[in-house]
């Protein structure tokens, strides 16, 4: 330790006893049980379902209730108690309607406050008192600690405790105290949240998800392909921006742009109305219960959808020409059309085109935007980059996010490791350098951060590369040979709609391939390590646990569009001191249904790995940091003057 570091530590620990106290505290912390990690993925803007999963900790709260209260509560009482913890405001309102007399309500308050305090003590038992205190509502720290750490059966304190409880009721604080305690329990049951990508996509409330995450106590994120479109737009990529606008129009979610983020689409709407007519291929796709806000909105969105799609295809051609190293010439599609015959040549085969909307395309220079299109794109990008709320959300996503994360022996990422049929990692050549495996992830993250840090630079390689990450064949976030958006719009032959997956998705069933990936990212690759992967829904009949447990696929299945394919609403993962648990969920209808029916959406919990010896903080990454700090403090102690 150099003299400067030594002096800094002495300032923090001014006496020898301060050093001893801190060492004792840290060494004790190492023996506490490991905190629970909660893994979710592919939220796709579905806020209410995601919020429910956070509130119930993927079933962990209900499980703790059953373990602790099953000999004292009926099944119905346990269900009601769980719902109280999930949705305290709603459950309190329901209870007040059910109970007939003031005495019944007072007794209900006393019973449930007592149960909540017991459950709070259980939930906080794996943490230091200091950490529990930080999780408490500031308005109730003193009274909660007095009730929590005193035995009501102790004779000398019995009257004191009873009076505290009576005063909570007498001063009309029962509701506030119960609500605060329930949210503290939610916070303590899960120590850390991992979000494996795609907050954004077709769902209508990604902004609420971002607000929720920004207020969450401990979270990290691994970026998904849909997230990259929004990050790319904020970084200055017009092409990323047009893609996200097209997706919002396609799924009738332009209100995200206009209402949630305050971006004006008036010029775009007027231009689309002038240039485009109704087109069945571009009508919005509606999910159950979805509809239109006003007469004529369906046509308006259909026209906007066509306008942004055509601008997107033009700019794709421009970026492809500007970046030959990305080898995407096969996607310069507007240059492959015979506009007189209305056909396109793809891979040596000619296809007729249908539902075309090439009004603004100049056959001699098909990738050129018109003057008005240029003006619209520039205006929209300025509006997006100046949306205070969107900037706040995406800055948070950048700060908390990464292409991948290694955490407590596990490797987390959203998409894939591009590979060939033999299991060799594919290389992307940029200039004189080649990037594959971990290096490809690191290079991708470097480009994302570079582009995001220079939002006024709109045509550099880093900004263009963000679009490549959306749909490039060797993108770790895409995982397919090509994105056939154009073909789906304009070609009837469904054979050319197919998007061929990278061999990775077959190879990840193989144990040796998964071990190879783990070793690529610095792990030993033994049975203490796992890959946790999102991005692809687990289809009905397929297994979320692959390669003898080395690979866990946890696409959350929040998007309603995928649920008929999967048969469920996807998976989440819990990793506590006892091991790994894969949780499958049933589709979430609404908060009101959950409260009214009393049913949860957790259907099955499957133990992936049960630890023979319960894991402690010492076995975690945080534990390693604490051990290093202890070593430094012992060194300081030995050399203390």
Swiss-Prot record:
Q: Please give the biological process terms from Gene Ontology that the record holds.
A: gluconeogenesis
Q: Provide the cofactor list for this protein.
A: Mn(2+)
Specify whether Hydrolase is a keyword of the entry.
yes
Q: Which pathway is it part of? A: Carbohydrate biosynthesis; gluconeogenesis
The protein's Enzyme Commission number: 3.1.3.11
The reactions it catalyses are: beta-D-fructose 1,6-bisphosphate + H2O = beta-D-fructose 6-phosphate + phosphate
User: According to the UniProt record, what class of enzyme is this?
Assistant: hydrolase
Q: InterPro entries recorded for this chain? A: FBPtase_class3, Metallo-depent_PP-like
UniProt key word Hydrolase? yes
* Molecular function (Gene Ontology), one example: fructose 1,6-bisphosphate 1-phosphatase activity
Q: Which UniProt keywords apply?
A: Carbohydrate metabolism, Hydrolase, Manganese, Plasmid
Gene3D superfamilies, A to Z: 3.60.21.10
Similarity section: Belongs to the FBPase class 3 family.
What is the protein name given in its UniProt record? Fructose-1,6-bisphosphatase class 3
